[in-house]
Regions:
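Aromatic- and Lys/Arg-enriched surface recognition patch
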Residues: 61-124
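Short, charged beta-turn/beta-strand-edge "cap" motif at the junction between a beta-strand
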Residues: 50-57
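A general structural signal for short secondary-structure junctions and capping/turn motifs
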Residues: 39-40, 55, 88-91
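Compositionally biased, charged N-terminal/linker segments
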Residues: 1-43
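Structured loops at beta-to-helix junctions and adjacent beta-edge loops in soluble globular domains
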Residues: 7-9, 50, 102
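Short glycine/proline-enriched turns and hinge-like loops at secondary-structure junctions
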Residues: 17, 42, 57-60, 76
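Surface-exposed, flexible loop/turn segments at secondary-structure boundaries
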Residues: 11, 55, 71
Length: 124
């Protein structure tokens, strides 16, 4: 089992949203490195839910990968901010995965705390 770090802005889609829904399609990713990481994910892998663009940013909970190799439908929707005119049904460019809520952490693990307690090599 691998562990991943996945981020979202809490006012856009936070861990409370995921808890209410139970699971979600983690779509709209338009970064090639992140897309390639998602392509490496396996069912049963765990992901830390990181709240970004908030004060303070940090890890707030844990999710599980429950489905992989999903073609991201938002790339085909011209009304979506994630629309990609270069993508086609025959040659999709973006993938996503489905994640299931596992739990909130009792307290936020802040970015500052991560930096203070772990070296980049340890976080690897």
């Amino acid at each position: 089992m691998a562990y991943w770090l996945m981020k979202s802005e809490p006012d856009v889609y936070g861990i409370d949203h995921l808890q209410r829904e139970g699971s979600t399609l983690w779509d709209g990713i338009r970064n090639y490195q992140a897309r390639n990481f998602m392509r490496s994910m396996q069912i049963g892998d765990r992901a830390f839910f990181y709240h970004s663009n908030t004060k303070p940013p940090g890890i707030v909970g844990l999710m599980e990968v429950v489905e992989t190799e999903i073609v991201d439908p938002s790339q085909f929707d011209p009304n979506s901010k994630y629309f990609d005119p270069a993508a086609s049904l025959q040659k999709p460019r973006w993938d996503c995965c489905r994640l299931r809520y596992l739990r909130h952490f009792p307290q936020l693990l802040s970015l500052d705390a991560l930096r203070e307690n772990f070296s980049p090599e340890q976080l690897g």
